[in-house]
Structures are given as C-alpha cells and as structure tokens.
Amino acid sequence: MAADDHFSLFGLPARFDIDAQALERAWRAVAAQVHPDRYATASPAERRVAMQWSARANEAYRQLRDPLLRARYLCEQAGVDLQTESNTAMDPAFLMQQMQWREMLDEARDDAAVFAELDAELSDARRQMRETLATLLDERHDYAAAGQKVREWMFVEKLAQELAAARPAG
C-alpha cells in the first residue's frame, strides 16, 4: 500500500469540499485492509508495518473529516506555512470582530440571551468560513488567502470552546 498524501490514501480528490460518506467508506476499506488483527499470525515486522498503516489511516481520516483540519492540511500540502504560533497578522475588520466577540463572551457568562446571540454568530462565522474556504481552495486555488482564513477559523473555534465552557447556569 502506498499513498503520497491523505487524499490519495483514500482514493479521493484533494479538495476541501469532499463527500463525507465516500471518505467514511474509503476509511473503512483501508482500515479493514491494515487492521492489526489481520496480521496476528504474521511476522513481527509485518505486524509493525500494519500498525503503522493503521495509525496513518486513522490520523488521515481524523484530519480529513474535520473541515478546519482538512483546510489546514490542504494549505500545508500546498506549501503554506500557517505559523499559527507566530503569525498573528489578521484582517483589521476581523480583529474588530474578535474584540466584539470577546466582549460578548464576558457578558455571556451571566446572560443567557448574550450567550445565545454569540453562539449564533459563531455558527454563522463557521458557515461563512466553510463557504469561503471551498471557493479559495477548490475554485481559486489561492492557498495563501486560504491560510489567512484558516487562522481566523482557528480563532473562532477557540472562542467557541471558551463559550461552551462559559455556559450560564439555568
């Protein structure tokens, strides 16, 4: 078994907008081929290789089934260094939106209505980012712009996690 990347491992086109059911079917087929139980009577070297392929298939599936991780993977495969730790440069309008969301998060801890409003705004932001990334990655092949959008989406996901942890009582 040989595969240069996660998509070719599953026989899928390298696209952001993928068929989730086709991914699941392909993963199940690959996982069945390399499952360590199939190699129980094989040599230690063959068992080790099967375990490595199984781990690789599981990691590839984990990354491809999550839209944000899939977008990040596509950008990295295209040579875009996302520099998520050091590159904090973002669109000024997004930075302003970030500040507004942070203020709402502080209020949402004690106010169920603000919580619901912020939750809805973050859901809408995720949907918009998915649509934008589908265009940037699959149609325009603008990986640099997609990388910027991925960094923004990562912020939105982090904020959504903080919001979930701050759910007001009652």
From Swiss-Prot:
A Pfam family: HSCB_C
Keywords recorded for this protein, A-Z: Chaperone
SUPFAM superfamilies for the chain: Chaperone J-domain (SSF46565), HSC20 (HSCB), C-terminal oligomerisation domain (SSF47144)
GO biological process: [2Fe-2S] cluster assembly; protein complex oligomerization; protein folding
J domain ranges (all copies): 5-79
A GO MF term: protein-folding chaperone binding
Transmembrane segment boundaries: none
InterPro entries from the UniProt entry: DnaJ_domain (IPR001623), HscB (IPR004640), HscB_C_sf (IPR036386), HscB_oligo_C (IPR009073), J_dom_sf (IPR036869)
Similarity comment text for this entry: Belongs to the HscB family.
Description of how the protein assembles with itself and partners: Interacts with HscA and stimulates its ATPase activity.
Protein name (database record): Co-chaperone protein HscB homolog
Native source species: Bordetella petrii (strain ATCC BAA-461 / DSM 12804 / CCUG 43448)
